[in-house]
């Protein structure tokens, strides 16, 4: 078995640089979408509905793109077609978003933006494993983490910096110029960064990957599918029952209508798992649904615990992304009118706050977590 060539620092840089641009786009979305929605007439109560694209596209797009990118090979490569398609669509969404004049168009553009970012971002996570030998994985993921943090800091700070350079932050008849220019610059940065990675890297072809001991293209692990075929339907009906219970509880307990979505997702997963199990039992397990559900059901216990942690952490993150701008604008800047200069000054300051938390998180991830992991 051959070993992959050692990558020098320049090679490590090229492999992960696209993530810098992707995170600029992601940070612009997180720090500014509530401001855009409210500027276009969305109420505070509407924000959670308008933001629903973000978690749903991640939930649906990531496993699908991950599944297909593992099984793709074209003359342009394995992951790079996804990089390119996602980057082009995300850049277009960033260019169009700040010129939205009606609320529903901005909400629709968010669906395109978030889905496109996920299309490009998900294969980037696997790209390090594809391109690097195992003894370089730590260095590769560390540099990727650095680019993630740097992109998030830069994207979050764009409107604040433009305001201090003299660009108007007033929302006169639409999105403020600071936000508009930030999205345009962010779209260009995202596209150029991803194109840099595409243009400076060459993926190993299937024969080379096989020589390195990697699974052959399209080769699927049969164990998850066999395990899925052997499963009973009890857990699937339990998911459906849990979802139905949540749906019933919403009016009884006067819960927010957004909770209906959680119940619907649990029901949908239960139905999907029944279909996946029946397909696996019928000898038709080599399909995306059975493979994805089989991988999910067969996760190690540690990963299931991590998934629970991620559930609560991402719940908190979305609450922060959705509501920080209106809360800071109202209580720290005394403004509730999204067209006012004070409100948009508050929106700029939220970008600074988000830049700080991203910067601190990156430093902790690079300096503290490796030492902590070594002790566990």
Locate predicted features.
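Core transmembrane helices of Major Facilitator Superfamily
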Residues: 26, 112-124
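Intracellular loop-helix junctions on the cytosolic face of multi-pass helical membrane proteins
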Residues: 1-9, 101-104, 120, 134-318
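Loop-to-transmembrane helix entry
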Residues: 43-53, 177-178, 256-267, 334-362
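Helix-loop boundary and gating motifs at the non-cytosolic
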Residues: 2-57, 246-252, 304-340
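C-terminal ends and interior cores of transmembrane alpha-helices
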Residues: 81-102, 251
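Helix-to-loop junctions at the C-terminal end of transmembrane segments
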Residues: 60-77, 363-376
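Intracellular juxtamembrane helix-capping segments at the cytosolic ends
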Residues: 33, 119-133
């Amino acid at each position: 078995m051959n070993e992959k060539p050692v990558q020098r620092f320049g090679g490590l840089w090229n492999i992960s640089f696209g993530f810098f641009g992707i995170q600029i786009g992601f940070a612009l979305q997180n720090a500014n979408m509530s401001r855009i929605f409210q500027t276009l007439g969305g109420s505070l109560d509407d924000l959670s509905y308008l933001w629903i694209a973000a978690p749903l596209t991640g939930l649906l797009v990531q496993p699908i793109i991950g599944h297909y990118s593992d099984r793709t090979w074209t003359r342009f490569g394995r992951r790079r077609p996804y990089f390119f398609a996602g980057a082009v669509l995300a850049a277009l969404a960033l260019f169009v978003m700040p010129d939205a004049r009606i609320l529903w168009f901005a909400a629709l553009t968010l669906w395109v933006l978030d889905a496109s970012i996920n299309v490009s971002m998900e294969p980037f996570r696997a790209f390090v494993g594809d391109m690097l030998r195992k003894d370089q994985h730590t260095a590769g993921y560390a540099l990727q983490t650095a680019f993630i943090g740097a992109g998030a800091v830069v994207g979050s700070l764009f409107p604040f910096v433009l305001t201090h350079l003299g660009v108007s932050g007033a929302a006169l008849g639409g999105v403020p110029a600071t936000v508009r220019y930030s999205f345009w610059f962010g779209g260009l940065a995202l596209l150029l960064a991803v194109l840099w990675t595409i243009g400076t890297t060459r993926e190993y072809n299937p024969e080379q990957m096989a020589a390195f001991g990697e699974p052959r293209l399209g080769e699927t692990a049969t164990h998850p599918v066999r395990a899925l075929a052997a499963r009973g339907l009890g857990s699937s009906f339990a998911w459906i029952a849990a979802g139905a219970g949540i749906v019933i509880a919403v009016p009884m307990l006067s819960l927010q209508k957004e909770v209906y979505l959680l119940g619907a997702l649990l029901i949908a997963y239960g139905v999907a798992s029944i279909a996946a199990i029946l397909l696996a039992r019928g000898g038709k397990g080599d399909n995306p649904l059975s493979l994805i559900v089989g991988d999910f059901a067969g996760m190690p216990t540690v990963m299931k615990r991590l998934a629970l942690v991620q559930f609560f952490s991402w719940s908190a993150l979305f609450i922060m992304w959705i509501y920080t701008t209106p809360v800071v604008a109202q209580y720290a800047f005394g403004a509730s009118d999204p067209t006012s200069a004070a409100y948009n000054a508050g929106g700029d300051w939220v970008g600074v706050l988000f830049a700080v938390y991203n910067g601190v998180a990156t430093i902790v991830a690079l300096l503290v977590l490796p030492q902590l992991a070594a002790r566990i």
